[in-house]
From Swiss-Prot:
Catalyzes the formation of 5-methyl-uridine at position 1939 (m5U1939) in 23S rRNA. Transmembrane segments: none annotated. S-adenosyl-L-methionine binds at residues 282, 311, 316, 332, 359, 379. GO terms for molecular function: 4 iron, 4 sulfur cluster binding; iron ion binding; RNA binding; rRNA (uridine-C5-)-methyltransferase activity. The keyword Translocase does not apply. One of its GO terms (biological process) is rRNA base methylation. It catalyses: uridine(1939) in 23S rRNA + S-adenosyl-L-methionine = 5-methyluridine(1939) in 23S rRNA + S-adenosyl-L-homocysteine + H(+). It is an enzyme of class 2 (transferase). Its EC number is 2.1.1.190. This is 23S rRNA (uracil(1939)-C(5))-methyltransferase RlmD. Residues 12-70 form the TRAM domain. InterPro entries: 23S_rRNA_MeTrfase_RlmD, MeTrfase_TrmA_AS, MeTrfase_TrmA_CS, NA-bd_OB-fold, SAM-dependent_MTases_sf, TRAM_dom, U5_MeTrfase_fam.
């Protein structure tokens, strides 16, 4: 049978044309949502109630994406971004929205996701909020050596790219660390080994400022001397991390960063937590303290109670819970962090606290050390705790505090708890990352009587 050529619609023209859109809300990733020819259109950078000019960049069956070209009618929440690297650096993505607007959006998005995907409606509590700028106590900067210019660039990666955007300061990084970026860029370019340097990690700890330089080969004596001189001049602890993951202090002594909790709680003795660069630690010190305090308030640990802390890390929640008198069992999947947690417990003189390494997706309910659990705290990674909840149903703890860095997995896991007879009592936003779309939350569940 003969087949005749039929011209397809010129989709490239449709994609390249600039069009006007009315934005009515934000998605949970912070992109503006509009409607166009029966499709949802996602427009990063656009805000609710705005009329914008945008260019379609992607067409799918049920949705499309567009690039913001111009804001024709701005929202009352639109502000001028303060960072000169905004939109080139891949870090912040909501600086164009007021801080109050960001928090209102995040709180509403959290409630909406929980209601839509878990059918859960709890009593919303005030969001945990802090400083909007200079809040990060830790950051990892990427390096890129240009073989042509023989220069090393230091900065953050562009959004969805391996490209390094050179920066000389960062408005969300703790001020002392931000002030070190430009001097470090100059220093690293003076080293003979600059072509073999990896990332630079900066840490603002309670016992000083730290820098970790990833190296792929040993540095010569002159380079080591320059690093030691820089460290002394800037009053910073510098260590090198080699290919084996080992750390070496440039002055021959390795000092690890420390932060304290409960130091602002009346009548409580502070706990100190030491951590190794590279291991997970909450980057917002102010919000972390508030988050731990809220978890303690909700769980109200009492002497004689047994509390299970899953995904316990190096003891961020475990140590304060034990300090207030409960018997705490911490379980973590990363062996190095279990070792660090045990060292932290010993350093703080806590004998009512034990840590175990375990596969949290496996059934741990029959482990000889598990026993009866009165209360449970969960602080999983973005993937959530779905597998863990399958065996935790046997434990039937009276209360569950779930700390989440992903509202989607929180909603999915909440549905499991609700099916097991729990009721959502409290739900609140944790604004751990101002100027970004990231939503963290804490939820309290209680077993129905």
């Amino acid at each position: 049978m003969a087949q005749f050529f039929k011209a397809k619609p010129n989709s490239s023209k449709q994609l390249s044309a600039k069009q006007s859109f009315s934005v009515h809300q934000l998605d949970h990733l912070g992109a503006g949502i509009a409607q166009h020819q029966g499709k949802v259109v996602f427009i990063p950078g656009a805000l609710p109630s705005e009329t914008v000019q945008a260019q379609l960049t992607e067409q799918k069956k049920n949705y499309a994406r567009a690039k913001l070209i111009k804001v024709e009618t701005p929202s009352a929440e639109r502000v001028t971004p303060l960072c000169p690297h905004y939109q080139s650096c891949g870090g912040c993505d909501l600086q164009h929205m007021s801080l109050a607007g960001q928090r209102e959006h995040k709180s509403a998005a959290l409630v909406d996701i929980m209601a839509k995907f878990a059918g859960a409606e709890g009593n919303s509590v005030p969001a945990l909020t802090g400083e909007g700028w200079h809040y990060r106590r830790r950051a990892r900067l990427a390096t890129l050596f240009d073989k042509n210019t023989k220069q090393l660039s230091l900065g953050f990666r562009a959004s969805s790219s391996n490209q390094v955007v050179p920066i000389d300061s960062c408005l969300v990084l703790a001020k002392p660390l931000s002030d070190l970026i430009a001097p470090f860029a100059k220093l690293l370019n003076q080293l003979a080994a600059k072509s073999s340097l990896g990332h630079l990690e900066l840490i603002d700890a309670d016992n000083g400022h730290f820098a970790v330089i990833r190296i792929t080969k040993s540095l010569n004596d002159k380079d080591m001397a320059k690093l030691a001189q820089f460290a002394e001049h800037h009053q910073i602890h510098i260590c090198l991390q080699d290919n084996n993951g080992e750390f070496h202090g440039v002055n021959g002594t390795l000092l690890l960063p420390v932060y304290q909790l409960l130091d602002d709680k009346a009548g409580a003795t502070p706990v100190s937590l030491t951590f190794t660069p590279g291991n997970f630690v909450q980057v917002n010190a102010q919000i972390n303290k508030a988050m731990v305090a809220q978890a303690l308030d909700w769980l109200a640990p009492q002497p004689g109670e047994r509390i299970l802390d899953l995904f316990c890390g190096m003891g961020n929640f475990s140590l304060p819970l034990a300090k207030l008198g409960a018997e705490v069992i911490g379980v973590e999947g990363v062996p190095d962090m279990v070792s660090q947690a045990r060292e932290n417990a010993a350093a703080n003189g806590l004998s009512n606290l034990t840590f175990y390494h375990g596969d949290l997706s496996a059934d741990l309910s029959c482990e000889p050390w598990m026993g009866k659990i009165d209360k449970l705290l969960l602080d999983p990674a973005r993937a959530g705790a779905f597998e863990s909840l399958q065996w935790l149903k046997k434990m039937k703890p009276r209360q569950v505090v779930y700390v989440s860095c992903n509202p989607a997995s929180l909603a999915r896991d909440s549905a499991v708890l609700l099916e097991r007879g729990y009721k959502l009592q409290k739900l609140g936003l944790i604004d751990m990352f101002p100027q970004t779309h990231h939503i963290e939350a804490m939820a309290l569940f209680e077993l129905a009587k």
